[in-house]
From Swiss-Prot:
It is found in: Cytoplasm. It is an enzyme of class 2 (transferase). It comes from Methanococcus maripaludis (strain C7 / ATCC BAA-1331). This is Adenine phosphoribosyltransferase. Belongs to the purine/pyrimidine phosphoribosyltransferase family. One of its GO terms (biological process) is AMP salvage. The gene is apt2.
Length: 172
């Protein structure tokens, strides 16, 4: 299946000059969603992954089905104040400024092999922050998996040393 045909391009969103890649049509189409899940799962099958981690919000949408297919758990990473239990946090760099991410303190056990699943790799800021958070609490980031990669933003360059999969690549 050509997932590129299932990704809607919305010009000038969220601001003028941005060509937004919308994954909603994938989520709406059960065959496209199954295909996406299968492709990520196939990539991870032989990597001995113990747990899937996904950043809010679209990382949840793609990470949970992958975890289900691999018969392993899923751990959400969220913005501050959204998780009800004790958390660990990390500050990470954005294009303009910084932000913070949190994970439950019991979300990952020391030494677990983690795959991070998200919808988009752009500048690499968010996934770099998630990776640091996983490593800070003792997990090993074994793979980074994305539905879409915006290659011209060079997020991959920030993630040297990580095993990266992206299903659809766009040049801006």
């Amino acid at each position: 299946m050509d997932l590129r045909k299932k990704i809607r391009i919305v010009e000038d969103f969220p601001i003028k000059g941005i060509s937004f890649k919308d994954v909603t049509p994938i989520l709406k189409d059960p065959k496209a969603m199954k295909h996406t899940t299968k492709e990520i799962t196939k990539y991870l099958e032989d990597k001995n992954i113990d747990i899937i981690v996904g950043p809010e919000a679209r990382g949840f949408l793609f990470g949970v089905p992958v975890a289900h297919e691999l018969d392993i758990g899923f751990v959400p990473v969220r913005k501050p104040g959204k998780l009800p239990f004790k958390t660990f946090s990390v500050d990470y760099a954005l294009e303009y400024g910084t932000d913070k991410l949190e994970i439950h303190s019991d979300g990952i056990e020391k030494g677990q092999n983690v795959a991070i699943v998200d919808d988009l790799l752009a500048t690499g800021g968010t996934v770099s922050g998630v990776s640091k958070l996983v490593e800070k609490i003792g997990g090993h980031v074994s793979a980074l998996n994305f539905v879409i990669e915006l290659t011209e933003l060079k997020g991959r360059d920030k993630l040297k040393g990580y095993d990266i999969q992206s299903l659809v690549k766009y040049d801006l």
